Amino acid sequence: MTTQSSAGPQSQPSRDFFASSPSATPGSPSKQASQASKQPDALVTPSSVTANTSVCADNLLDHHQHEPQHDAASVVIGIEGSINDSAAIHRRRQQPRRAAVQNAKPLFLAEDEDDAINWPVADQEEGDDFFSTQLADQKVKRPARATVNSDEKDFQPSTLSSLSSPPSETVYKRSPPSDDVQASNGPAKRPKKSWSTPASVATTKSAPRHCSPTPDPRLRHDAFDRRYIGTFVLSAWSLSKGSSYVKPGDAVRIFRPRKKHATAEPKIASKLTNGGMQKAKQTTLNFRGASAGPTNFFTSKQKSKEKEHFIVRFSNMRGFEVGRLPLEVAIWMSKLIDAGIAEFEGVVVDCPPSLTVGCDIILQVKAYIKFDAFFSTLLGSREFDDQNEALRPETAESDLEKTLRERKISLLRMFRVCDLKPRLSNAILKSHKASDDFSSEAMLDQYGGDIQGAVKHAGSDLAISTENGTQLPHAGEDASSTAIDLDVEGDTDAVAHLEIADQLQSAKRQTDGDADTEENDGTELNLNQLDQVYRKAQANDAHLPEVEPPESFVLTLRPYQKQALGWMKNMEMAPGQSSSSQEQSVTQQGNGDTGERNVSLHPLWEEYEFPLDYDNPQANERLILSATRLFYFNPYTGDLSLDFQRASKGSRGGILADEMGLGKTIMVASLLHANRTSDPGEESEGEINAVDAAEGDVSTKRKGSAKQTSLASAFAASTSSVDQRKALLKASVSKGKASLVVAPMSLIGQWRDELIRASAPGSLTPVLYYADTKGDLLAQLESGKVDVVITSYGTLVTEYRRFLDGGGASNRHLSVSAPLYCIDWLRVILDEAHNIKNRSTMNARACCDLVSRRRWALTGTPIINRLTDLFSLLKFLRVEPWGDFSFFNSFVCKPFQAKSTKALDVVQVILESVLLRREKKMKDKDGKPIVELPPKTIVVKELEFSELERRIYDNVYRRAYLQFASLKANGTVTRNLSVIFSVLMRLRQAVCHPSLVLKAGSKVQSGGIRKDHVDRNGEVGVGEGDHVEVDADAVEFGLDSDHVGGNGTPSTQDLRELVAQFQLDEAGEAGDDSTESYTKATVERLIGEMHGDQATVPPVVSDGENECPICLEESQISPCYLPRCMHSACKACLVDYLGQCKQKGDQGACPTCRKGPVQETDLIEAIRTRPATRAASGGASPTDRPGKACTLTSVPSVIYVRNNLRTSTKLSALISHLNTLRATEAAFKGVIFSQFTSFLDLIEPVLTRYRFHFLRLDGSTPQKVRDKLVLEFQSPSPTNHVVLFLISLKAGGVGLNLTAANKIWLLDFWWNSSIENQAIDRIHRFGQTSPVSVFRYIIKDSIEDRILLIQKRKDMLIKHALNTDNHPHGTKPNSEMLANLDLLFGE
């Protein structure tokens, strides 16, 4: 141990050699060193010698990892001495030993060549540095590592291999990097830089040619291989038996055993076969899906199921394995070794003279942290699988977050056992760690104090005792509700302890080793809880001061909108230093003195000082003379840095969450006029970070005033190089002058029109940046003529992908491919900001990576379902410290899952400072409603399936139920959610229209099923290989066009011919004169009504003519006529009457004159297109045909349609309702919403058949066409006729202004009522002057009934949300999702 500590640290591989090789040579280090002076200088590489030569070289390489060298020549000499002594080593291997020693596994076998191949790239170059004194381009490189273990993939460090420098330059000059730097996002070439260039110049001025705009950030610091962290003592246990292994004072090597790959083993020699070859046992490969049932809906689940072990072993210096470290230590130590973050050396303190298996060995362990660990952060180099991330549940822990969490826990544990305490820490961390309290209650006390009515947290204190006395919580409990007693001195982190303990339990149960395999669900909120969250934020909204807009804003604001303008102007001001509750002063620990920085430490970071290793005076000397003496650690994310982490002044901006329809666009327009430019001295993220880069180590430069910085580098998920981005933004052409508005595609045109309407001519210039309207954005901004750029989320994501695919800021053509990401925006405004609620989506990542000085999120629903919906908004706004998911998850999500009401109180405190929300029902300071809107009426109509529809639906439901039951029986429901949701979608479509469950290749015409869609067996195809068995009556869903004019509406001549063919009886003889006379008179009257020519209409024969002979009701609005006799009756009465006749086996006949036979499809329906009082006005040509652009003059006052269209129950109810309204109201405008565009396809021909004028908007509608459609719908109709707007719920359910309508039809149900409410608020909003009616259709005994039950069930959850979990420990209740599925498929 003394010999190893006599010199400073030397360059070494990024991971301990024994992590990939479980063996070591039994050569003596002292003897190897003694042979150093006997060998000449030579160049030797591990791949150029025999197996034994490689063995010896590798052993000495590993030895030199712990024993630094004085110069490069001694390294070469020592290595060659070891190589030439290979014969002696071989003879020592053959010496007889006792049985225990013979059973011991010598660590160097013939597999060493494979070990060398599997070394990481950084290990290869480190080895070459030891064996060579030549330049880097002359070295012989080993092959790249073939495979990476699953648990190491996310831990691949960005290593910097330090070349061996002359002794005189080691301390005072920075070591240049090797040719290939293994960065976190792949190999990166070393910047070409002169060896004699001073470090300071290289940091601030010199930029490498042909590479990134700025040098490697490692060059800003004095490079070192590793630094001493601390020493701790542990009790290991022996795996060997004998007396010749170790004794007190011996040094030992600590390493990770090589992992076994799941491949068939080769043939091996066996003594049982007398030296022959025995076939190895066959290994069955499990590909995690072929035999384990259906695959998961995102593939990262497979990775988490792979077996993982925490074994850490130690061997003597001769290379023989001695024992293992205890599992409590191995859990966190193995993660650090695998990730190349730390290395460990040990010395035997005490052990028995003769070892036995299982006996205790006391070790003193030294911990070293590697230089590369400070640059291997995953926050700046995230690799995402877009497809899998999109399918990932919103609250599920991603692979990156799991890796960061394990890294964080391991580092915290290492610092704790080494008794390494922070030198500087902010007030939150200091107080919380001192009291061991990282719960929501502590955060509430820190940020907002107590809140009245808070419910006392009820948590379980039961615990499980482990072998070493550690108190472990029961599975599923949170750290905030469990007392943990760990035998570690100093301050502790309860959250980290809990996760360490969970890992320990998992390892002892021999599970897959995941610390947290359960998805992070359980943060769903119901309406009452949402009201509770918003209540505190809305408490003082009525008393906000009103601020008048500038003269350039030409519209008149309402009082509540003036209050919003004043609040937004205040939020864009720089927060005061003393008044900001989120700024924490930096206090200094040690020696009892305190001090303040002009630049405050980031509230999530702590400052540490590298301790001195008193056993290594040379290393201490280098540390004292080095400028890199401090490092920084984030205990919430596990990030390490050598750069000072500065805090910002606070976020500029907030969340404008006014309810839909209150005019958020107009409020933001007034802000754009009020705050046109940035404040003097206001700096952007790029400028702030560039200043930090230029200053280098802030710990040595205390001067300078505090500058604002948002958390782009700490929170934003940027896949580009941070330094490259800083330089790029520093040269931005905008420099905080223009604002960017990001909105759904349907709204960008509306944003432009609203901004122009609200602005005086020439005062504000908005431009669209979308499709062919993009132009040269940078040139427009440079001209100074553009104030606001409006783009869509889709365009932003497209440019973000180019930004990533092009190498980020290093792309020379970034200004052409992705100009939105090379502009320093004054403000970024997200309209409908709930589009980024899922933090894993490209929408969220693209928005968060924009650089801006001010940020705004506009949404009527900042929280839709879960508390985690709020996180993405906080991250986008750079709200410290809540924009970090580890922090948010620890103090909000997990306590809420543990039934702690304090979690909601913390959310209230957060929103109080960044959110403004007003609702339509709220009142102003005088007690008057802030906005007076006309009443809104919601009518729900219950319908029943027809007999045929019921058979089709029951068949689809039966097959769906069987599929769900099969998955549930196999326990694979959660792994096949995509299948379940597909089945549920088919059920919901079957409720709307049976044709929607046809095969994708089938085409539906006129809202029906064609005959060729039914096979010989009468089966109608359904999606995904299912079939619905129906009889040939399914064909009746088609439209029989016989005797029908174009589009199913008979012309005048057609009507005469149609009636004439029914006037002949079965014998071909005409009827009596009275019947014939009545029929002719009725036909002429109907034709006259159709033209609106009342002068030619014969007088009514009798007053009782309009009376239905079945129900005896009068005033038939849309009567049906029997063509044989032209007697009339209500359509519903006739259809029911003819159906009863068919059931009895009788032929249908006229209920008045008994003339027949009559079928249901023979009926002729008379439909009025406008009220009867207006029937005389206007006229039409008999040859007019219907279409999408029908006008009043082209539509007859009465149309006649043959009842030969078999459609769905919902569509029939919709058409009947529309016909009734058209006959009673002069004119109206209505909007029809549906989630399925295929259902809209079926509605279109039916509306055309009944001569309704309609427009349509869905996701396929181009943006320019959308603007024209909305403008046409909002404009007054010159002919004052009925206009309908068909809109898909996703494409037009948000943002649109459709106040011209006053009637709404919602044809299907969504799982979340907030989406439907947003659609309703497109009509019932600011500017609406008429009462609004909402009509909903629900089918009895269908899945829609159960969807409504789920909505009601969510509302009732508040009654049980705060109750403690009564389930026995060790079991889990069904999740909310599974409970809902059980409800949907229940009996």
UniProtKB/Swiss-Prot annotation:
Keywords: ATP-binding, Cytoplasm, DNA damage, DNA repair, DNA-binding, Helicase, Hydrolase, Metal-binding, Nucleotide-binding, Nucleus, Zinc, Zinc-finger. GO terms for cellular component: cytoplasm; nucleus. ATP binds at D658, E659, M660, G661, L662, G663, K664, T665. It is found in: Cytoplasm; Nucleus. GO terms for biological process: DNA repair. A zinc finger (RING-type) spans 1108-1154. It comes from the Eukaryota. InterPro entries: Helicase_ATP-bd, Helicase_C-like, HIRAN, P-loop_NTPase, SNF2-like_sf, SNF2/RAD54-like_C, SNF2_N, SNF2_RAD54_helicase_TF. Residues 645-880 form the Helicase ATP-binding domain. Pfam families: Helicase_C, HIRAN, SNF2-rel_dom. Residues 1-49, 132-219, 503-528, 573-598, 676-704 are annotated as: Disordered. The keyword Repeat does not apply. Residues 1-14, 194-206 have a biased composition (Polar residues). Residues 513-522 have a biased composition (Acidic residues). A motif (DEAH box) lies at residues 831-834. Residues 19-40, 157-168, 577-589 have a biased composition (Low complexity). Its EC number is 3.6.4.-. One of its GO terms (molecular function) is ATP-dependent activity, acting on DNA. Residues 1213-1379 form the Helicase C-terminal domain. Belongs to the SNF2/RAD54 helicase family. Probable helicase, member of the UBC2/RAD6 epistasis group. Functions with DNA repair protein RAD18 in error-free postreplication DNA repair. Involved in the maintenance of wild-type rates of instability of simple repetitive sequences such as poly(GT) repeats. Seems to be involved in maintaining a balance which acts in favor of error-prone non-homologous joining during DNA double-strand breaks repairs. This is DNA repair protein RAD5. It comes from Mycosarcoma maydis (Corn smut fungus).
